[in-house]
């Protein structure tokens, strides 16, 4: 799905925590084992790995120490909402700027040289104030500015760029953007560098882009334009959240074709995104993440184009295989 059915060359394997640990997707050891297996098969550095950190859970800091010593993740992954599926009954939500709880972790991350902190934000239902009472605030970015300013040696990568809407049509959010020029929580993220004078805040697009790339490309243009204008083109990162949605190729194709309409550029002072292989899209697709993860793109590309996975893909194509633009997910059915 990732390396054969799409144009993806390097990927990052992640996980997620839940109040009920039996729901956990992959343990930190399993993520690391996946990285080892793929890179052994390929003979190159194809797969990077997160370690998930879980503040407020028993033994969480000991797990951080263990990961630093043995797992050696490429970056960290955290969920300020605690459990991303439903309001945490265990109270595992937390803030990025909690000096007592989180700052000791930041100190360890800086000392270990694992200084990229990826944080899940946004993606709540339309009735979030009612369905996530007392918890929804932790999905916003109102805790990010101070943390980023206090820890300039850390890179804060906000997953989904804190876009609020989840599993709903982007039409209503686009209407709000057309009226106010703002996109719920994503605009807040884009304004942080100017408000706090920081350059270590990044927006990853993930599921946020997946939910609108095909269903409402105008909103996708407004979303990406907002991020590029506020964060700068050098701090917007590609992400697909695949294989949740199958091969990421359909999202790759959508981004290649995406452009901000001229009237939107003029009204909101958005830059043009340009060609698929132009400066801005190349930075989003690969260059920005490569810098964060210390990947020399020229060296890496040389190794990847001649590795075992490249050979497997060549065999696949020779046998008639093609890139997949299929999107996995639910289909809404409406009664007549």
Predicted regions and their residues:
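N-terminal cationic-hydrophobic initiation segments that often serve targeting/anchoring roles
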Residues: 3, 38-42, 68, 148-149, ...
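Short catalytic-loop micro-motif centered on adjacent basic/acidic residues
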Residues: 48-52, 157, 239
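Conserved, mostly hydrophobic/aromatic
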Residues: 67, 76, 109, 160, ...
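Alpha-helical elements of Rossmann-like donor-binding domains used by nucleotide-donor carbohydrate transfer enzymes
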Residues: 33, 63-66, 104, 143-146, ...
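Active-site gating/metal-coordination segments in enzymes
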Residues: 15-139
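Catalytic pocket-lining loop regions of alpha/beta-barrel enzymes
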Residues: 90-238, 246, 263-280, 315, ...
């Amino acid at each position: 799905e990732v390396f054969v059915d799409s144009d993806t060359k390097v990927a990052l394997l992640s996980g997620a925590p839940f109040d009920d640990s039996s729901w956990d997707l992959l343990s930190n050891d399993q993520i690391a084992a996946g990285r080892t297996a793929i890179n052994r098969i390929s003979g190159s550095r194809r797969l990077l790995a997160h370690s998930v950190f879980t503040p407020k859970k028993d033994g969480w800091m000991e797990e951080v120490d263990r990961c630093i010593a043995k797992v050696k993740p490429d970056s960290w992954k955290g969920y300020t909402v605690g459990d991303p599926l439903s309001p945490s009954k265990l109270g595992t939500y937390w803030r990025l700027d909690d000096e007592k709880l989180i700052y000791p972790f930041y100190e360890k991350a800086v000392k270990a040289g694992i200084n990229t902190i990826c944080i899940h934000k946004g993606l709540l239902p339309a009735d979030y104030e009612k369905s996530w009472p007392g918890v929804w605030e932790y999905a916003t970015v109102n805790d990010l500015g101070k943390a980023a300013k206090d820890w300039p040696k850390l890179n804060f990568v906000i997953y989904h760029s804190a876009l609020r809407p989840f599993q709903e049509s982007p039409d209503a959010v686009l209407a709000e953007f057309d009226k106010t020029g703002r996109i719920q929580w994503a605009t807040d993220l884009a304004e942080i560098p100017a408000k706090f004078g920081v350059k270590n805040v990044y927006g990853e697009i993930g599921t946020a882009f997946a939910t609108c790339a095909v269903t409402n490309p105008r909103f996708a243009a407004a979303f990406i334009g907002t991020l590029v204008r506020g964060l700068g083109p050098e701090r917007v990162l590609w992400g697909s959240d695949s294989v949740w949605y199958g091969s990421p190729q359909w999202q790759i194709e959508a981004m290649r074709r995406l452009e901000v309409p001229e009237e939107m550029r003029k009204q909101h002072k958005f830059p043009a995104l340009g060609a698929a292989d132009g400066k801005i899209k190349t930075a989003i697709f690969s260059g920005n993440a490569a810098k964060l993860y210390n990947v020399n793109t020229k060296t890496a590309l040389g190794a990847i184009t001649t590795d075992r996975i490249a050979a497997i893909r060549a065999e696949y194509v020779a046998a008639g295989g093609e890139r997949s633009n299929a999107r996995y997910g639910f289909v809404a059915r409406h009664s007549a």
